[in-house]
């Protein structure tokens, strides 16, 4: 009988993720073993498998969010919070095709056509998603183009910068980990989550195009599965880097979520109006939100 694949990646100074092909995953610390007998001290060098790779990737996301899990805000969705989320969604998607093509070009230069082809296909699939967010903003009565030109939510800025930086590195394999993190989180959104957002929108208004596309109802689930298979096929050093970046991106994403979600309704509305240079009276007068109620979880 063939031996099951075991993969492991050191994530922090004292935590490694260990995953078996069977799907079993655990977090390993050096204190779990006797001195000088840590079986996971040396970086892995063997082949990967889909079962163990998904354990590493999802384990990295869980570990990234674990640091703030107890203080992670979980408010009910509101229109103002959702508008801020759509602006964030625009900024995390508008440069994705360009960045992925830039990374693909670098891998072609490095003689890695298989990685370049994967990234080029992802770039094609992500093209135009920023326009979905703009359509949703316009459907909510907001001048989307002007808003996104003048406003980037503070919690989103570090995430956008991270992706930009990853894609211009000499060896930009980490961009796959970043992309997986965002797509995996998006794929967790179910029909019920979209229905909650639709329920706070004005009647006969379709403002969930981006959210539907970036949920379990859209292409994200398929993208996640494809990425798992592709990462599993990579050399061990590449798999290690992808998993480590998945963790780093999860940290940034979690902190960004919380930064935006802890703002009051009034704070978010003030930011929107300052960016536009005008009041948004239809948001002030809406009966669906009030006072210091907290905002909606970002859409991307």
Ranges and model annotations:
Residues 1-299:
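Non-heme di-metal
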């Amino acid at each position: 009988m063939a031996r099951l694949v075991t993969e492991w990646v050191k994530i922090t100074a004292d935590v490694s993720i260990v995953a078996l092909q069977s799907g079993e995953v655990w977090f390993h610390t050096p204190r779990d073993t006797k001195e000088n007998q840590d079986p996971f001290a040396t970086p892995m060098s063997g082949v990967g498998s889909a079962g163990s790779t998904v354990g590493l990737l999802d384990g990295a996301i869980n570990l990234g969010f674990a640091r703030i899990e107890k203080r992670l805000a979980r408010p009910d969705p509101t229109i103002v919070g959702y508008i801020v989320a759509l602006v964030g969604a625009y900024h995390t998607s508008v440069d994705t095709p360009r960045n992925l093509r830039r990374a693909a070009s670098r891998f072609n230069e490095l003689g890695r056509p298989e990685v370049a082809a994967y990234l080029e296909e992802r770039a094609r699939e992500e093209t135009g998603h920023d326009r979905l967010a703009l359509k949703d903003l316009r459907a909510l009565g907001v001048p989307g183009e002007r808003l996104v030109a003048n406003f980037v939510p503070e919690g989103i800025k570090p995430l956008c910068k991270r992706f930009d930086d990853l894609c211009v590195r000499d060896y930009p394999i980490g961009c796959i980990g970043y992309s997986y993190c965002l797509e995996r989180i998006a794929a967790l959104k179910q029909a019920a989550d979209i229905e909650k957002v639709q329920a706070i929108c004005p009647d006969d208004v379709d403002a969930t195009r981006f959210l539907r596309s970036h949920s379990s109802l859209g292409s994200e689930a398929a993208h996640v599965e494809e990425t798992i298979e592709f990462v599993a096929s990579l050399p061990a050093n590449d798999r290690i880097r992808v998993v480590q970046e998945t963790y780093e991106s999860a940290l940034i994403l979690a902190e960004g979520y919380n930064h935006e979600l802890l703002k009051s309704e009034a704070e978010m509305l003030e930011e929107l109006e300052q960016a536009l240079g005008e009041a948004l009276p239809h948001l002030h007068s809406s009966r669906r939100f009030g006072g210091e109620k907290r905002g909606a979880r970002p859409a991307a």
